[in-house]
Amino acid sequence: MTWRETLCGVLVVVSTITASGVKAQEVRSDQDILMQLERDWDEAFHRKDVAVIENILADEFVVTYSDGSRADRSKELRLATEFDQQIDSSLLDEFVVKVYGDTAVVWFTQHLVGPSKGRSLALTFRYIDVFVMRAGRWQCVASQSTKVTST
């Protein structure tokens, strides 16, 4: 078999695989995974979906809220079930994600819009969350939010 025949055979196999719809497995970066975890957490909180949040938060999770109060995992989960403020929209943006081995830090901004006392209220918070990689998945161990008073 000549090199041309071999090349033609390889091209036929490659084009057959491509035409049959075989796709390479999509590989997501840690940055993409962490940003999606933040979005999943936000959506789950507003839906009161504690199961999703339980999978994201590590057992030793600690949060410092924008008023300076601090809470643990159990209180954060309880707050998710008690959440009763109507939210028209919650947008997360301005992500900065840094991965340091099995630790990652995620900074982002949250824009909330919803009714308050008959008027539309818009609030902005900046977050910093710390994640660790355990058993092949990212878990949040610490979070802090700061209310933005002016932009």
What do the PLM-derived regions correspond to, one by one?
Residues 24-151:
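A beta-strand edge to alpha-helix "cap/lid" segment located at domain peripheries
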Residues 1-3:
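N-terminal secretory signal peptides that target proteins for export/translocation
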